[in-house]
Amino acid sequence: MPRLAASIERFPILGNFVISRGAKTEAAVVVAAIEDKACRGRGEGVPYARYGETVDSVLAQIGSVRSAIEAGADRVLLQTLLPPGSARNAIDCALWDLAAKRSGVPAHVLAGAAPPVPVATAFTISVGTPEEMAEAAA
């Protein structure tokens, strides 16, 4: 029988990250882990305040579906149990990871997707003086 657990991992941000909506000194990540026999699937979600999410609200959402997940709810049923957001993402990723580990087949193959490749990303410069922002952008 699967078991669902949730925890918080905190990662310090070098200096302060400042944008118009506020400042951050750490990134809090909610981790969902689903264990079943010898396999453990893991997924993450980062609560996003702009959408009304907090670490506590994401943990509560995960807790609200614990019995369904432990009773065998799958990724399809999960879509009806939780709204889009960090909690659903964390559990969905944990279910994909668990299925991949059980089968010995990478998650992207199970999903029918192409192999992962490097992607371009963006970096947001913190609000500061023009000189500080120019230095950070250099």
What is the role of each PLM region?
Residues 1-138:
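N-terminal capping/lid subdomain adjacent to the active-site entrance of alpha/beta enzymes
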